[in-house]
């Protein structure tokens, strides 16, 4: 592989606590019933606006995004931790001279800040997220490929949800499903990823199979 794209939430970082609290705060602030925890967990992966569009009246969606991002920026992001073995895995991949990038649906400034705060920004040549022009995972992947002039056939995305796999397949890069994150492995297998990995330290060996 000439490049690896990493999803952030659920792949590199366990951000479930901060994300859950941010959604709960948003629904409380809007004075609407909170979804149950299973539903909130399903929001971890797709674009933020898509989750609110599926659960709120259209008139409240933009307000919900603003409330969520403000709370997450001020409090939620600081409740994230790296998954075990992530740093060791990144060092091993870096030792193989494989360029690493983050491609996430998370708002780009927040993604950059989170990677810096958790001490992993130094392992990545680029950290790309959503903005007004890049909403879906495929948009972020397309941008990262273009700005770095990377070959699709030698690039893979590593992620824990179907949205990572769909994004990669839409653009035409290889896909690796990981089992330690927010996604359900049985569901991931339905999307026929090129690789399946059960531990961060197995990423390199899995790619070489």
Spans of features found by a protein language model:
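Conserved Lys-Pro-Asp/Glu-containing loop-to-beta segment of HAD-superfamily phosphomonoesterases
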Residues: 3, 137-165
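Substrate-recognition element of Asp-dependent hydrolases with the DxDx(T/V) motif
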Residues: 23, 89-115, 128
């Amino acid at each position: 592989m000439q490049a690896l794209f990493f999803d952030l939430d659920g792949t590199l970082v366990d951000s479930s606590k901060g994300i859950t609290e941010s959604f709960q705060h948003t629904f409380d602030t809007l004075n609407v019933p909170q979804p149950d925890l299973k539903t909130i967990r399903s929001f971890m992966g797709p674009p933020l606006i898509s989750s609110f569009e599926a659960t709120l009246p259209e008139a409240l969606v933009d307000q919900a995004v603003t409330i969520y991002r403000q709370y997450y920026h001020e409090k939620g992001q600081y409740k994230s931790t790296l998954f075990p073995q992530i740093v060791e895995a990144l060092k091993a991949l870096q030792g193989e001279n494989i360029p690493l990038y983050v491609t996430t649906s998370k708002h780009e400034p927040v993604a950059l800040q989170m990677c810096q705060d958790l001490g992993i920004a130094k392992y990545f040549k680029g950290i790309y997220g959503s903005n007004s022009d890049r909403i879906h995972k495929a948009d972020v992947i397309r941008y990262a490929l273009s700005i770095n002039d990377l070959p699709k056939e030698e690039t893979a995305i590593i992620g824990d949800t179907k949205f990572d796999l769909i994004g990669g397949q839409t653009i035409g890069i290889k896909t690796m499903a990981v089992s330690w994150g927010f996604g359900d492995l049985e569901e991931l297998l339905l999307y026929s990823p090129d690789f399946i990995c059960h531990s961060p330290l197995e990423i390199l060996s899995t790619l070489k199979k």
